[in-house]
Amino acid sequence: MIVKNISAIQYFQERFDIIDTPYQYTVDYHPAAPKKTFTTNPTFVAEFHDCFAHALPLVITNENHMITSHLWPLLHNTKYKPQKTHDLWSKWNDNMEITLPPAHKQFSEPYKYVWLPIDEHSANNAWHIWIDVISKFRLIEKKFSHKYTDFIYVLSGPSEYFDRVARELFPELRYYVMPKNTTWKFGHLLAPSMSNHEDGITVPDMIKWLRHKFGMVCNARRKIFISRDDAPARRLINAEQVFMALQGWETVTLTGMGIKQQIELFSEASHVVSTHGAGLANLLWCASGTKVIEISQTEMLDKKVYPVISHHLGLIHRVILGEKVEIRGDKVKGVKRKKDFNDISIQTSALFELINGL
């Protein structure tokens, strides 16, 4: 089968109604940040008839268009190298020959099935699940004026984190999970776009919708220090020294904590201090005015994901740079990039100066 590889956002703009138009904002989270002004992509809900969905994930339309970009980016150079991770194609190009396995299942009912693609590398990352998967419920509600639970969702692969969130927050949600390397056929498939691009340029209304839909209204009075002592990397090696100096603060470990517990914890936080990590996705639940200090390092100063969330929700967010402490040995499972495989040390005096200045 010869398919046209679709990557331009104009393809979707010409075919489907736009829900969120592009929006520009500025986030001044650190004086040395390489970029501070960002522009969002338009959002939409695509509709495909007589199409095939593959668990890689990708969609092949009835016009033989291959859809990955703007629904879930297919990073073929790093994650999906032909003949190593799949046998669908041998060479990536604008027009390419693919070998799609026969459809294992077929679904014909219109306006019922919603495509939720995600790759196995991101499937249990809290930030990706909230920002790139669950956020798509909002586009479905805005497009069709129905509750998101009126539809059936199709996840391109398993996600234990999504399962946990579903059990606690929306147990009535109906969804299927595609087995690896399988193809399903749909008479009509709804495909919401991402509300995030370039790893953190998020649509403001999406972030606000998540807090409104799943957050709690609490008395924000707790000062919390998020421990990453059980994480494989980005641990604060002088965390004990820092905490001893943080009079009246709580040290919290998120591992093993339920989803509702985490939402309640961050809803009650007036101050949050943490090294950069997926646990900061919980900033979604903080009340406006919450003060956030994110401990990072120079090599990661382009990571704007959490400062942008804070900007949209009216939080006061600052990034402080610590000293990188290399970890000996090979990168371990759970760390995506080699540059992320290190720990951090922070000057206590600099941290307190920043806290007192907020």
PLM feature spans:
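The feature primarily captures lumenal catalytic ectodomains
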Residues: 1-358
